[in-house]
Amino acid sequence: MTTMSRSFGRSDLANGAHRDVAVWLLACCFMVAVMVLLGGLTRLTHSGLSMVEWEPIRGIIPPLNDTDWQLFFEKYKQTPEYIKVNAGMSLAEFKGIFWLEYIHRVWGRLIGVVFGLPFLWLALSGRIGRAMVPRLAGVFLLGAAQGGMGWFMVKSGLVDNPAVSHYRLTAHLALAFLIHGWMFWLALDILADHRSTRRRAHGDVGAVRSWMLGLTGLVIVTLLFGGLVAGLKAGLIYNTWPLMDGAIVPKDLFPEGFHSLFEDIKTVQFGHRTLAEITIVVALVGWFRTRARLGTQTPAAIHAVGLMALLQVGLGIGTLVMVVPVWLASAHQMGAMALLTLCLWALHDLGRRI
């Protein structure tokens, strides 16, 4: 059992509440995954700058009549995106981009309610112990920060250049993955404590867990570079694989030194591609070696990670060579979340076998 798992203790969840709390956390994980999907669709359909104000309470109410719609549309007409990109857009076209951004924002508020109210009830009713309260409170605070980060990102696209900061977009994405991953890990801890068992396996489990820890780190860095690629629209160029600009290592990388790794479109795409290629090699080699070491005792989570890594690299290559179709790019983004989630599952499971 992992150190984090042990820290909860059987007293942290009273009266048989283990499974209920775990199911609630997993439901919140699912809602965050849907939120990430909606956010990706909002970005890919260029809908994210259609709402130019952030009103956490009043913003729940959408335009209800023609007057309301005209008011929202007139505000949008003052933005750089309308002036430089969408000049002449009709009200009907504006409604098309508005609704997706609106749903994205309201879904975020709904997550806050679905997480916050049960958390208060669980804490006040004593159904969770003191050790868990600060952990769940931390998740709630991260969720609140995520709302602010979302608006901080949108604001960057409402001044001069009609595109959000790729740094802020990546931070917004990273926070979503952090919230999702933290809740998932807590749910696994609760379920492991409920079962109250430790499974013994082959002595090589420690080495396998070290490999999985390294792979998880690679997945995280790769998905962060994926956020930079998305923010810079770097997937719209050099749409070939395995060659990039006619070479394995293209010319003119790092034109401005180290900063190019985060700001030059060509270098950023190369970084993401290279990290993805390293990740799939590490995943497959580790998967095969684990099967050789542990045989039939290989955890199901390890097999799931290997298969998902294969699928994810296929989704990434397809997204690139097909020049970022919305449906495939969305699948690739969700594949990243699925792969990270499976890595966390594998890490947790391996920790209980040591």
UniProtKB/Swiss-Prot annotation:
GO terms for cellular component: plasma membrane. It is an enzyme of class 1 (oxidoreductase). Pfam families: COX15-CtaA (PF02628). Its cofactor is heme b. GO terms for molecular function: metal ion binding; oxidoreductase activity, acting on NAD(P)H, heme protein as acceptor. Heme binds at residues 272, 332. It catalyses: Fe(II)-heme o + 2 A + H2O = Fe(II)-heme a + 2 AH2. The chain crosses the membrane at residues 21-41, 106-126, 139-159, 171-191, 212-232, 268-288, 304-324, 326-346. Its EC number is 1.17.99.9. This is Heme A synthase. It comes from Paramagnetospirillum magneticum (strain ATCC 700264 / AMB-1) (Magnetospirillum magneticum). The lineage of its organism: Bacteria, Pseudomonadati, Pseudomonadota, Alphaproteobacteria, Rhodospirillales.
